[in-house]
Curated annotation (Swiss-Prot):
Name of the protein: Purine nucleoside phosphorylase DeoD-type
SUPFAM superfamilies, sorted: Purine and uridine phosphorylases (SSF53167)
Keyword Transferase: yes
Superkingdom of the organism of origin: Bacteria
Annotated catalysed reactions: a purine D-ribonucleoside + phosphate = a purine nucleobase + alpha-D-ribose 1-phosphate; a purine 2'-deoxy-D-ribonucleoside + phosphate = a purine nucleobase + 2-deoxy-alpha-D-ribose 1-phosphate
Family as reported in the entry's similarity comment: Belongs to the PNP/UDP phosphorylase family.
Amino acids binding a purine D-ribonucleoside: H5, E180, M181, E182, S204, D205
EC nos: 2.4.2.1
Organism placement in taxonomy: Bacteria, Pseudomonadati, Pseudomonadota, Gammaproteobacteria, Enterobacterales
Amino acid sequence: MATPHINAEMGDFADVVLMPGDPLRAKHIAETFLEDVREVNNVRGMLGFTGTYKGRKISVMGHGMGIPSCSIYTKELITDFGVKKIIRVGSCGAVRMDVKLRDVVIGMGACTDSKVNRIRFKDHDFAAIADFDMVRNAVDAAKALGVDARVGNLFSADLFYSPDGEMFDVMEKYGVLGVEMEAAGIYGVAAEFGAKALTICTVSDHIRTHEQTTAAERQTTFNDMIKIALESVLLGDQE
């Protein structure tokens, strides 16, 4: 049954959904990597599609920017449409000098300056972590594809234009691999509602050096991340 934000029916979505922030990137992923694609959501322009990858039913849908937006969509997908696994596929900014542009980062955990998980966890700290099997499958898929993926913590920021530049020093000290805006929220939602989640990011810019990838480069390097996500789903089916 349709929700306020998703005009689909039970069965329209696969049990696994890849989720970029940008709905147009969701469309690109569906058209580039999936077969027999059909649109399953267009409310508020947040496009969602379902198709097959190597015969496996998979969905892809945008989640917007920030924890509030992605929390709405992931919650509804899990509780109203039977989704069991969510893989966020997005971009992140690097803060460590040993993390380079175009590196693929697998988010084993996610720190955050948001209070959303403390709200749902009775004002206590919640360890926002990815599902172990999904992490392992993504690592194995990356190796099989010849992609040297980094594995570690992300930082999910509430502010894109943050006034706190000193926080980047703290992130670097604690070994944070990349800064983005959603992983901690998605991991919290998955934990609350009994689903599994993973975030895979491509480093699109470096906060320290101010380097950035071009639009053309992002198209190519982001595809490596999508292939890892898709192949990891197939590996998960073999368990």
